[in-house]
Every structure is written in structure tokens, then in C-alpha cells.
Amino acid sequence: MLVVIVGPMFAGKTTELIRRVERYVIAGRRAIVFKPSLDVRYDASKVAAHNGLKFDAFVIPPDKDGVEIIRKMGAEYDVVAVDEIQFFPVDLADALNQLANGRIVIAAGLNLDFRGEPFETTARAMAFADRVISLSAVCKLCGKPATRTQRLINGVPAPRHSPRILIGGNESYEARCRRHYVIPP
């Protein structure tokens, strides 16, 4: 079974991933969690949520070698979880789909980048998923459900030509509803 958890930043994707993995561990299932090496915001060796919740993880490069590590190591476990899937190459979605035959696979990631465009790896994983859990955050400006991630530079929406990947937290990003999300110029 493949479960994909998506939404904007601050929606609780990592918290939900950890919650699900912990349930299986309590039930006696062997679980392994992976995270990309470039995600060092809160803890370099654990999957860490914005709210401080953490879980031990294997830190791997977000490249084809990392996908192979997930494929090989994951085959030895009952439950395989991968956080921040948007940072991995699109091949990860195929690996997760294959691993889901015979085990529980839980993946979490952003579905849209700061430009409002889909992350290819997340979109492909969603297509293969047995279940997609779409979470929303709370709009920083009005308090309504937020489905977008706004990148800010000095408090102003980042321009479209900014790098697609920029690791950060609430100092660089805000959750926004559709009404308050500003499409980058």
C-alpha cells in the first residue's frame, strides 16, 4: 500500500508521517524512515517536524543513488517512509510504487513549489498512490485553509526566477490561501 501525504509548508505532513510510522512500530512492524541529506533545518539525522516532533531517519543523497538505497534497504522492512519526496528525482515515485507491493509505504512532500507548479516526483507518487492525504495549513494573512506556499525575500513574494529549491522554514516561507497567494512575477 502506498500512502502519499501532500500539502503546503506548515500543514503537518511530517507530523502525519511520523504518527503513521509510530503506529506500525507499536504494532511490532519493522519500519525504516528516509530523509534527503539537504534537509538539515531542525535535525541532521532525524525526520523533524516544525512542531518539534522527531523520528530517527536514514539520511541519504536526494539523487539516483539515494533512490537505489531506498529501493534496496526498503525491501528489508515492513514499513518504508520517505519525507520531503519533492527533493528526489522522479524515479523515486517508481521505486515507492514497487516497494508498495508487499509492504506499507508512506511518503510525504510538497505538491506545489513556491511558483504554484507541481513537483514532478510528488505528482507521480500521487498518481501511483492507493491513498492521497491532502493537508492544508492556515493562511498567515487571513486564517483560512492554506493550500499554497509563498516564498518571501525581505517580506516580499520571491520572483519567479528564484531557485526552485531553497531550504528554509518560517523565515523564508508562509502558508497562504488561494486568495492571498501571490503568483511570482
Swiss-Prot record:
Tell me what reaction this enzyme catalyses: thymidine + ATP = dTMP + ADP + H(+)
Q: Mention any one GO cellular component term assigned to this protein in its UniProt record.
A: cytoplasm
Residues involved in ATP binding: G7, P8, M9, F10, A11, G12, K13, T14, D83, E84, I85, Q86
Please provide an example of a Pfam family that matches this protein in its UniProt record: TK
Positions with a binding annotation for Zn(2+): C139, C142, C177, H180
What one GO molecular function would you report for this record?
Answer: ATP binding
Enzyme Commission number(s) from the entry: 2.7.1.21
Q: Main location per UniProt?
A: cytoplasm
Q: Nucleotide-binding as a keyword?
A: yes
Q: What class of enzyme is it?
A: transferase
Keywords (alphabetical) are: ATP-binding, Cytoplasm, DNA synthesis, Kinase, Metal-binding, Nucleotide-binding, Transferase, Zinc
Record GO biological process: DNA biosynthetic process; thymidine metabolic process
Q: Where in the cell is it found?
A: Cytoplasm
| Top-level taxon of the source organism | Archaea
NCBIfam families registered for this protein in UniProt: PRK04296.1-1
Instruction: State the name under which the record lists this protein.
Output: Thymidine kinase
